[in-house]
Amino acid sequence: MVNIILLIVSALIGLILGYALISIRLKSAKEAAELTLLNAEQEAVDIRGKAEVDAEHIKKTAKRESKANRKELLLKAKEEARKYREEIEQEFKSERQELKQLETRLAERSLTLDRKDENLSSKEKVLDSKEQSLTDKSKHIDERQLQVEKLEEEKKAELEKVAAMTIAEAREVILMETENKLTHEIATRIRDAERDIKDRTVKTAKDLLAQAMQRLAGEYVTEQTITSVHLPDDNMKGRIIGREGRNIRTLESLTGIDVIIDDTPEVVILSGFDPIRREIARMTLESLIADGRIHPARIEELVEKNRLEMDNRIREYGEAAAYEIGAPNLHPDLIKIMGRLQFRTSFGQNVLRHSVEVGKLAGILAGELGENVALARRAGFLHDMGKAIDREVEGSHVEIGMEFARKYKEHPVVVNTIASHHGDVEPDSVIAVLVAAADALSSARPGARNESMENYIKRLRDLEEIATSFDGVQNSFALQAGREIRIMVQPEKISDDQVVILSHKVREKIEHNLDYPGNIKVTVIREMRAVDYAK
């Protein structure tokens, strides 16, 4: 660019110098060059024009070259700037990567330090806890040491006192003191054990029994020892008695039932403790009344016929009960045995209906606990089958039931259930326990069974006498038909801790001395009153 400008300047200077030279020459040779002046001027003009054209051309060329050089320089500068920027960015990128790695290492180190700090804090807490524990133990040891020293002093004083006693007196004093000291601990342990057992079992047991009772609705007709037979008129009484009482004696001898004919209008009473015989007598007497032929031969014929009919009815009762309980493949002899329970009662409760109810309850409880429902229902259904034949075979109904269950190849769980439902042997399965619970639930619920008034009063009187036999008992009351005994104690003789022990002693004596269905609740009440008067 500078060279071009210098070239232009040089050209201009050359032109100026040439013009000056021509002017001088023209001036010096004015006279000689007038002819050529116009030519010279013209040449000068031409030269000037050409110089201007050349200068303009040179200027344009210089501008184009300058513009091209500027673009080239600009591109070169941009390329250099780009390369420099890339180098700078690469350096920044490397530095950022290093910074990032450094930050990561610092974060990891910080996390490690935090963990170490937490571990140190945790160890410090543990050490503080151990230190506190050691301090507490040290205090406890000091307290125990003081107690031991105090006890040693007391024992020393007691030994000094005992030294003047006989061996028997000293033993009695020591035993009394030991019992008094252990009374509180025994009562506390009993309360804790009872509370723990109640917390874990009462709610579950109540829920299970409530569900079982809600899902089963049983009905019973109270059984009696007498049966009334309605007569069309009172004249039939004489025909039943017969000449010289032959008819009534024949009926009584064949059935083993007392036929009572009194002043009750149009009624004959059949009395007997065997419901099957009483039912046969009823069927026979009703058949005689309907037939009208009443004489010893006809009575014998109808008694035999009704015995066969009774066998069929017994089998039908057994089949219906087995179908109701869902006991398939029951041996025909067992079906007949179970049918006979329709005519057996226990405390006024029909034994067959009781067996069906126990089977259903046991099945419900087994279902709630995930046991074999069908086996539980079968075991509950057969648990009292020995009652159908215990009058004909020696042994208790439990022993007879076990024998027949083994004879007819019943499941071992069924055999053990029959053996254990009254506590004669230990239950080997959960089903045996469930059947025992269902048996108690069915038989002990209010209204399920009846007792005679005399036995009822005697049982209540015995219950109250057992309670009042203990020292410190002020009064006792048998409540809820003998299912609860409420004991009022003298507060100056019985302490709060001794109340718990007294309730257990009363319970043990009741269990050893009384026979009763279900459970008896023992409640001991200690009441301390302080009365004063403001004057």
Swiss-Prot record:
Coiled-coil blocks: none
Family classification: Belongs to the RNase Y family.
GO biological process, one term: mRNA catabolic process
Region of interest (Disordered), ranges: 118-141
Upper classification of the organism: Bacteria, Bacillati, Bacillota, Bacilli, Lactobacillales
Annotated protein name in UniProt: Ribonuclease Y
Gene: rny
Domain HD: 351-444
Keywords carried by this UniProt record: Cell membrane, Endonuclease, Hydrolase, Membrane, Nuclease, RNA-binding, Transmembrane, Transmembrane helix
Species in which this protein is naturally found: Streptococcus pyogenes serotype M2 (strain MGAS10270)
SUPFAM superfamilies on file: Eukaryotic type KH-domain (KH-domain type I), HD-domain/PDEase-like
